[in-house]
Amino acid sequence: MVLLPEKPVWMSQQQYEEQYGSLLKLKESEKCNHEDKQLALQPKESSIGYSTQERIAKLSVPEVQDDDKNSKVRNRKHQRFDLEEKKKKLRLQKTIEEQIKHHDIEMTANRVVNVDHVVRQHYNERTFLSKKHNRNYSPIIKLRNFNNAIKYILIDKFTRAGDVVLELACGKGGDLRKYGAAGISQFIGIDISNASITEALKRYHSMKNLEYQVILITGDCFGESLGVAVESFPECRFPCDIVSCQFALHYAFETEEKARRMLLNVVKSLKIGGYFFGTIPDSEFIRYKMNKIPESVEKPSWGNSIYKVTFSNNEYQKNGNEFPSPFGQMYTFWLEDAIDNVPEYVIPFESFRSLADEYGMELELQKGFNEFFVEEIPNWVNRFSPKMREGLKRSDGRYGVEGVEKEPAAYFYTTFAFRKVRDYQE
């Protein structure tokens, strides 16, 4: 029997037919064969006997009542059967989707396809799912609050009133209000997920008192020149004062070519004296975890009940606890209610700093989330709204994260900021 996944709501019919065209044809052929068999097995009508109405008319009253009771019992059985069938169908659907995703990840790990396809599909799907859930009931709500606090502080630290901001991989526009508080004059957001950009536009139109221009564009920030994406938007005021990238830069380190294209996009978009800042996985924390895993483990992994990191091979351990290359060191990252086993890439920070220097940028800041938060929170606690302060409060009355959320929030990520000091000559 041909198993065919249902079309996701965010996928167009054309994309669905392109991806599963061969399966659709097999399914149609199977359906026709099944209908032919059913037709052949169907009993022919007998000319002898009574019609349904005539049979009911001949029944006595007690027989009709018994038939009603039996009918209700049968209906209940059918309802239970239908419910079980629905559950089976959902389980089967989930299994098929997981198999397809596993296949896509394997293809990415073997470099048959690049990571863009998997990333775009994941964030299109997450955008749809997020509409159905109230984030206030998220199991990682404290982690989200902590990450937002880090971004608020970073934005305030490097952004000035009147600045023009370019955000790479802007997602659903979650930082629009943060930039509003900084008093910027223009925000240019670019993201590879068209569903995320659509949601960002809705968010922007629903906001009040945002006194700056917002331009949202679907485009590839890492794989191609930004000129391709922004050429239809002459209102963009390049060069910018700020380029920001939050929790997404790791996708650029799939290859050296991508990492260099990303940095070229940054320096071409940025004024001399402007800042490039963001948040990335902390390569030193990843090394610390990997160093504790023996070479005998083929697929090193670690995590807890809300997050998990899994490498596709143990080349790091075989190479004397060093990554064989600064690029293409893939792992899958799962975070409860946020990231569903999406391929990501290690950003060895010294390699990142060296490349940035080559492109005319000097390092201004690099601190892990925990260190950065501990240093900055005394100056910020009274600047946050009461709701934000409450969202950051731990069970001991202090501010930050605790329990299972602490590792993926406070230790897995680091902040960075570079300042452009000279133009890059290609």
Swiss-Prot record:
Localization in the cell: Nucleus
SUPFAM superfamilies named among the record's database cross-references: S-adenosyl-L-methionine-dependent methyltransferases (SSF53335)
Listed name of the protein: mRNA cap guanine-N(7) methyltransferase
InterPro entries with a match to the protein in the record: mRNA_G-N7_MeTrfase_dom, mRNA_G-N7_MeTrfase_euk, RG7MT1, SAM-dependent_MTases_sf
Homology family: Belongs to the class I-like SAM-binding methyltransferase superfamily. mRNA cap 0 methyltransferase family.
Keyword Isomerase attributed: no
PANTHER family per the UniProt record, alphabetical: MRNA CAP GUANINE-N7 METHYLTRANSFERASE, MRNA GUANINE-7- METHYLTRANSFERASE
Reactions catalysed according to its record: a 5'-end (5'-triphosphoguanosine)-ribonucleoside in mRNA + S-adenosyl-L-methionine = a 5'-end (N(7)-methyl 5'-triphosphoguanosine)-ribonucleoside in mRNA + S-adenosyl-L-homocysteine
Entry annotated with the keyword Methyltransferase: yes
Any single GO CC term annotated in Swiss-Prot or TrEMBL for this entry: nucleus
Positions bound to mRNA: N147, N148
Entry GO MF terms: mRNA 5'-cap (guanine-N7-)-methyltransferase activity; RNA binding
